[in-house]
Structure formats: C-alpha cells, structure tokens
Amino acid sequence: MARYTQRPENALKRANEFIEVGKPLRALDTLQEVFRNKRWNYAYSETVIEPLMFKYLYLCVELKKSHIAKEGLFQYRNMFQLVNVNSLENVIRGYLKMAEEHTEAAQAQSSAAVAVLELDDLDNIATPESILMSAVCGEDAQDRSDRTILLPWVKFLWESYCQCLELLRVNTHCEALYHDIARMAFQFCLKYNRKSEFRRLCDKLRKHLEDICKSSNQTTGVSINKVETQQLCLDTRLYLLDSAIQMELWQEAYKAIEDIHGLMALSKKTPVPKTMANYYQKLAMVFSKAGNQLFHAAALLKLFQLTRELKKNLTKDDLQRMAAHVLLATLSIPLPSAHPEFDRFIEADKSPLEKAQKLAVLLGLPQPPTRVSLIREVVRLNVPQLVSEDFRNLYNWLEVDFNPLNLCKRIQSIVDFIENGSENALLTPYIQSLKDVTIMRLIRQISQVYESIQFQRLLQLASFCNIFELEKLLVESVRHNDMQIRIDHQKNSIYFGTDLTESQREYRPDGPALQSMPSEQIRSQLVNMSTVLTRAVSIVYPNRERDQRAKLRTQMVNHYHEIKDREHQRILQRQKIIEDRKEYIEKQNNAREEEEARRQEEESRKAKLAEQKRLEQEQEERERKRHQNEIQAIREKSLKEKVQQISQTAHGKKMLSKLDEEGIKKLDAEQIAKRESEELQREAKELQSKLKSQEKKIDYFERAKRLEEIPLFEKYLAEKQVKDKEFWEATEKTRIENAIAERKDAVGQQERLKRMYPDRDEFLEALKKERASLYVEKLRKFEAALEAERKKRLADRIIRRREERRQAFLREKEEERLRKEEEIRLAQAAEERAAAEARRLEREADDEKRRAQYEKQRAKEEEAERKIKEDRERLARDLASERERTEKERDTWRPRGGDRPSAPAVGSGEWRRAAPTASERNERGGERIERGGDRIERGGERIERGGDRDRDRKDNEGADSSWRVRREPDSQRAAAPKDSNAQQSRDDKWRRGGERDRDFRNDGPRRDRDDGPRRERDDGPRRDRDDERGFRRNDGPRRTEEPQRETGGNWRDAPRNADRENRRPAGERRDRDVRETRGDQRGSAPKEASSGGGGGNWRTAPAAREEKPASKRDQPQEKENKAADDGEWTSVKRR
C-alpha cells in the first residue's frame, strides 16, 4: 500500500499545529517528509517551499539538529540552485542568523547565570561548594557556565558554518555567499577564541581551493581561471591572514601567506598596490614573530619600495618614519655566522638554504637575501639620508666608522631616543637586536686593537650590557667560529687571537676594520710576500710587463686575424639563430595568445549557453509551476462547482442533507465523491431490483410475440426465393446475348486485318535481306574472336596446370628429401650415442673378454667374406644366363603386322609396333626428336639399375614389395660385375611406385593425375593444340584418334588403370621389363650414333657423328645414393 504524503501547504499547517501543542519533533518529522518526497520537491515554486524551509530550519535550530538541517539544505540546493539562487541565499543567511542569535542569547544567559551566582549571597561570597569546586578544577564559575550553556550552541553554530561552506563550495552562482560565510566563520572563531576550529577551518578552505584547481569548469562548478573567483579567494585569504594574526596563530598565518602568493602568481592580472602593500606588511609581521630578522627587513624594504614608487601623496613625515623603520630593521639583523655548527651535524628534511629560497620566493626575490645585500640596497635607495636627524648617523656608526671606545655611547643615545619617544613605539622591538649587533661590533673592533683586555674595561665600553650577557655573546662568537677568544676567569681577562697557527676561515671583514688578526696575518704571509715580490720585479724590470703586454697584444691580434672570419660567421649564425628563436618565440606567443583568446571565447560561449540554458530552465520551471497552479485552481473551482452540482441533484441533496455545515467543510473532494458514489450505489441497487421485476414481464411478452411471428417469416422467405430465381434467369439471358454480339464484332475485325498479311510479309523479307550481310559479318568476327580467346585460355590453362604439377612435384621432392635427411641425422645421432656407450662399456671390460670378442669377430668376418664371395659367383652366373636369354629373345619380340625396317639408324621405338606409314612417320617425327635426348639419358640409368637387383628383390621379397621394405645389400652391390652389360640389365623397379614411375614417364600418370572435368572438357582443345605443334615428349598415341590395329601393338596401346599406383601382376611386369631391356639394348647403338636419340626414322635421323667417350657425368656410377628422391621423373642423375 502506498504511503500517504501530504501536500507542502498542508504539511506546514500541520507543523504549526504540532508546534502549538508543544511537539516540535513531530512538526520537524512532518516537514522532513515533504523534502524526502520526490513527488512534491520539483512541483512547487519557491514561494510555496521557502516558508516551509524557514520553518524547517527554525525547528532544526531550536532542537539543535544540525545533521537534519544539512539534509534539508542540500535538498533545497538541488531544487533551486539553477532556478532561483536568491531564494537559496536567503534561506542560508536566515539559517545562520538564527543560529548566531541563539548562540548570542546563550552567551548572555551564561553571563547572567554567573552574575546571579555571584550576587546570591553578599555576606557569604565564598561558599563551601565554590571552594571545593575551585580545588577540584582550575575553572572559575564563568568557564563552567559557558561549558554548560554556551558550548553546545557554539558547537551547533560551528557545524552550521561548516555545512554551509560544504554546501556552496561548488556552485558558481553562490560564490560570493560562500566567501561571506567564510568571513563569518573567521569572525566566529575570533569572537569565541576557537583556535582549533580556526585551524580546521583553514584546512577546509585550503582543501576546497585545491579541489577547485583540480576540477573542470562545469555548468555549476567554480573555475579558478576566472578573475572574479581569483579576487574573491584572494580577499578571503587576506581576511584569513588578518584573523590569524589577531589570534596569534602564526603557522596558519604563514600558510595563508603561501596561499596568497600562489593566487597572485596564478592570476594573470597584476594585484593592486594596496593589496601588495597589505601583503608585505603582514608578511613582515609574520617574519618578525618568527624571529627571522633577515626576511623581516627584506619585507619592510619591499614595502618601502612599493610605497615610495606608487603612493603619490606620501608626506615627508611618513617617508622619514618608514625609512627609519627600514634602516633600523636592516641594521638590527644579527651578524651572519660563517659556519654554523648545527648545519654540519644536524640533518633535516630541508636544508636552511632551501628554506631561505622558499621564503625568498614569497618576497619575489630571485635568491635569498643577506645582511650585506640588504645594507647595500638600503644605501642604494638613499635610505640613511631620508631618515630624521636622530637616526641619520646610525648607519655610519655601525657600518663605516671605527671607534670602539665611543660606539656604545652613540648607540645608547639612539636607544634612549626610541624608548622616550611615544611616536617611536613601532621601533621598540628592534632595541635588543640593535644592542646585540652593537656588542658584536664592539668585540670585533676591540679584538683588532687589543690583544687582551680586562672584563671591567670591556663592560665599561659596553655600557648597556651586563657581565652575563657579555660572556654569552663572547661564547657565541667562539661557538660559531667567528673569532678567536679565550676567557681567563682567574685574571678576569679576555684574550684575542692568541693561537697564531689557527685560522678557521678566510676572513672577510664585515663592517669597519682597522687591521687583520695576527692569525690572519700569518695565514696571508705568503700572499703578502707574493705581492711584494711582484712589485719588486716590476721596479727592477720596468719594461718586462710592457713587452709582455705588447707580445700578448700581438698574439691576440694574430689570433684575431686567424679566427675573425670564423667568429664573424659564428656571430652571424648566432644572430640568425637568435632571430629565428625570436620568431619562433613570437609565433609561439601569438599561437598561445590565439589559443587563450579562443579558449576564453569558448568559455564565454559556454557560459552564455549555460546561462541561456539556465534561464530557459527557469522559464520552463516557472511556466510549469504556473500551469500547475492554474490546474490546482481549476481543481478547486471544479470541486466547488461539483459540490454545487451535487446539491442540485436528488441524491446529492439527500447526501448533503445527512451532513451538517461543519461536516461539509471537513470533507474534501475525494470524500464528497465517495459519499456521492455510495449514494449512487444505493439508488442503483434499488433501481436494479425494479428492473429485474420488469425484465420478467418483458421476457414473457417477447417470447409470445416471436412465436406469433414465425409463420409470417416462413411465408415471406418462400415468396422471396421465387422472385430471386426469376431475376437470375433474366440476367443470365441478357449476358448470353451480349457475348454473341461481341464475338461477331471480333470475327469481322479479323477478316479486315487478313488483307494486310501480304504487305507485312513483303516488309519483313526486305528488312531481312538488308540486314543479312551485316549479321553474317558480325557473326564471323564474333566466332573468330571467340575461337582465338578459347585457344588462348586453353593454352594458358595447360601452361598453368603444368606449372602447378611441376611445383607440386618439386615440393613433394623437397619434403621427402628433408624427411630423409632428418632420418639420417637421427640415425647418425643414435649411432653416435650407441658408439659412445659401447666405447664406455668396452673400456670397463677386461682384457680377456676383449680378446675373446676379437676372436669371435674375426671368425664372423671370415664367414661373411666367404658368403660374399659365393654371392658374387652366383650373381655372375645369373647375369650370364640372363644375358644369353636376352640375346635369344631379341629376335622373337617383333611388332605384328609387318617386317622390321632394315635401316640401321632407326629409332628405338620402331621395334615396338608395326612399321608405320609415311604420314605417321612424318607426324611423329618431331615428337621423337624431342624425346631422343631424354631417352638417351634415361637409357644408361635403366641399364645401371639392372635386372640383378630386380631379380634379387623378387627372390627375397616377392612381386608386390616396394623399395621401402628392402634394398640390395652392399655386399651384393660390391660383388656385382662392373661391365656395362651387367649394368644395362638393371632396371628402375626399386624406385617408389615401381611400374608407376615408368608409366609416369610415358604419360600414363599424366592422364591419371588430371581430374575428371579436365579429361572430359579439356582433352579435345588440348589435343588440337598438340596436333598443331606436334607430339609432346613421352606422349603416347591419342585415344580418340588412334585407329584399331588388326595385328601387332605395344605397351603404349594397352588400356591403363585409373589407379595412381597402376600396378600389374608380377608376371606382366617381368615380361614388360624384359621387353624394355631388349628395346633399350637394341636401340643403344643408334642412340650413341645420333644426337636426337631413338625417337625418329631414316628421314628425320641426323647425320652420324664421331663417337665421343662418355663424360664422367654420363658414366654409370658404382654406388647409388640411398637418400635421394626415388620418385623423380626428370632426367636428373643420382649423386
């Protein structure tokens, strides 16, 4: 169920009622519910919410509920910070005013309570209770009363200030209010002497300033780049500095000075002279309280310069007073110590030099000032001449004149003048410092005149100093290593510079000096001697220096002439660089100014847009509220009208008659509507009961009426059916007649158009005759272009596929080679590891075992040699029998269908088939010439891989084994005969694939490797192109164009298997190997005699050449490389 919420005006009335009956907490809860309800927060204007907020804050102040007040203030800020800032400012100021009034009232109440206690019994002022209380704690009655009565209100007021500052720190529209509240908080701390709260307030403001510097410029955010914001922050920090000085919180004052300096450095606008004068004045005061006389004098000097330059109406008296202040502050600076011992032994986070540099930055100085530099600046500004007559000689007495006997008397007169003059109260703090400086001057001057002096005499000279102060100053001088002093208390004497061998630092006299100390004289004796000798040499040789100068001048002139051009160029280059740099800097400055102008313009544009948006929002909010007020007024008016309207009705009169006048006033529109609805429901029930009785009557009457209507409806429907049938028949008859008439018209139109057919035919024939020749010409050109393009594409496809096959083969070959090399490497590594392990085991075995193993190995080697010899003899016999069988079968293997040609130079392919006709020989001649060289190269290779190895593999492995399973043993290869006949009997079957390799050479796999689509679509164009250029190398007869031979044939004519392996039974392979061996042997003589090889006939065979010995590359090699590629189909020889 939804929670009931009151309207703001009703909540205010109810809160007043709670206040009247003495329940402020209930009243505060009622108002708090309104601010927590989001429904009413933005639905009403400030004229409705502002009185509610004042009442809410009044209750919070009365009940000291600062956290509840904070919640309401934040809600009110969110509602009206963009709509009506003045309302928010009025609420906050009213809240703080109420808190201040209650705090002041509490303070007065506390004072009055103490006064009543004091005046309670005049005869018995010291009561036992007061005596015991004073013994227990050190507080008096006023302090206890303040802690009980005043302190809670002070705490509430402090929390109120903090809440308001936190509330307004990010709103640019309430920026002035924020700084006003900060000043009010400073006044609160001053009034009630709240130093801890003042420190927390300073930290809070410093944190807010850091947040402002870090945050971006939002719609309601505060930007530190604005001049107004910088000025407000600067004024607040100056007020903070004044408050800190009044409360004597010098640490906070120093932090405020740092903040002020940072704001002035951040501001692009030069601060006004009045602000700078106030800044230097406060800074000098802080330095004075910190005991830093050096920077105090520097701050006064900066203030003096600023006032003298910028203040036009400065009177002479004011100038003299300021000059005397600056002069006295400068001369009162303690004499600097050369080597402070704490700087050598104490390690701090920051060295004194870094601290001095930081303080110098606050004064705008490039480096930390010193006493000498300040005195020099004072003299440059002519300050000693600007002071009055009484102070004019002070500078000369302390810094110029050497008169130790009258020094203290002179300074005493000035001290007396300062102490007696009422207008010189500002100079009183410098008296003690001036006395200390005077005593130090006196001691230094006395040390230059006397070697020893009595204490009493020194006290007479230092008239304004006692013995304890004097001894302290003497010890300090020795401690800081400024002077050599020894005090003899027995003789009551003081000795100066007694140790002639000790000189701790180079002495540079500061102030008036008569002579150096004895130790300094001894230390500088060599320097003095060098000076005297130099002077004597100049007297003895007066022209030497002149000659040296002339010689040096000549060298300088020569050197100048040597480097003048280079220096001139360097100077010109430097000038050019400077000019370029100036231009670059100027461009950068212009760009920066343009960027700054753009940024400012963008910021102003954004500010204008934000302001315009705010105004639009305010206008929309006002319109919305006005609209809501109008709606509310209309609702109230309609409520009154509704009451009047209800009173005019019967049930309304009944309902209103039951209520008296007071009851009607207490009811609202909803309750009136509820009463009206109840009255209407009651009347409706009565009416419903009446209607039920009437319904029964009407139902009976309606049923009787419908029973009587049924015969009449049936008669009407029968008549209507007859009429509808007659109407349909008449309509159908009319439609048929219209269709017949339309057909007659269409037939007549067709007959008229038939007479135009001859003319149409004549026109079409004439048009076809005119266009026929042009069509035929275009068709012929198109077919020619189509044929050329088809041939071109077929040729490109043949070349591309051939290159793809070659690349695939080379890639497979390279992969196989790498694999085998890796296997060999692994095998070698395994062998090396096994050999190393064997060697290690052999070293561990004894001599007898090694000898026994040696004998066994010897027996095995003899047995192996015997077996090798037997194998060689057996192989020789097998080879001889194979050679005889080959010679017998050479004449029996003839092509069927004709006799062998008698020409001796026929190609090796003539014996394989019947003698071709002349046309066939001419057709295949070019292809045989191309194949000749390859056949010659392959012939020797096939002969090398002869039948010995094939037969051995068949005997040991069977017909279907491959080269991967077994190879010929090395012993058998070594035992094989070396003659050419034995080598010619070797075949190619040890290669990968066996028969497939030879089929690949003879174009078998070339067809098999092509896919189906190529064989079906591309064979025709490819064969046509091959017919134009002749047979390809190693290409067999074409399938589609080869005529059926009645007799004869060879292995090229046999059908091929689609399998890539293309393997045949072992018997068939043996027969074919025998036939190939015969053919190769038979064609060997012509191959050697012709350069084209065995691919031609007597017409195409070239002339015989002289037989040359086979080159080393063509000679058969004894040993074959087992790791070479076994699947190659090119003519590359094995290494």
UniProtKB/Swiss-Prot annotation:
GO cellular component, one term: multi-eIF complex
Subunit structure, interactors included: Component of the eukaryotic translation initiation factor 3 (eIF-3) complex. The eIF-3 complex interacts with pix.
Compositional bias of kind Basic and acidic residues: 588-623, 829-899, 920-971, 985-1045, 1053-1081, 1104-1125
Domain of life (superkingdom): Eukaryota
Function: RNA-binding component of the eukaryotic translation initiation factor 3 (eIF-3) complex, which is involved in protein synthesis of a specialized repertoire of mRNAs and, together with other initiation factors, stimulates binding of mRNA and methionyl-tRNAi to the 40S ribosome. The eIF-3 complex specifically targets and initiates translation of a subset of mRNAs involved in cell proliferation.
Family statement drawn from the similarity comment of this UniProt entry: Belongs to the eIF-3 subunit A family.
Modification Phosphoserine, positions: 908
Official protein name in the record: Eukaryotic translation initiation factor 3 subunit A
Key words of the record: Cytoplasm, Initiation factor, Phosphoprotein, Protein biosynthesis, RNA-binding
Molecular functions per Gene Ontology: mRNA binding; translation initiation factor activity
InterPro entries: EIF3A, eIF3a_PCI_TPR-like, PCI_dom
Region called Disordered, residue ranges: 588-631, 829-1135
GO BP: formation of cytoplasmic translation initiation complex; regulation of translational initiation; translation reinitiation
HAMAP family: eIF3a
Domain PCI residues, every copy: 319-501
Name of the coding gene: eIF3a
PANTHER family, alphabetized: EUKARYOTIC TRANSLATION INITIATION FACTOR 3 SUBUNIT A, EUKARYOTIC TRANSLATION INITIATION FACTOR 3, THETA SUBUNIT
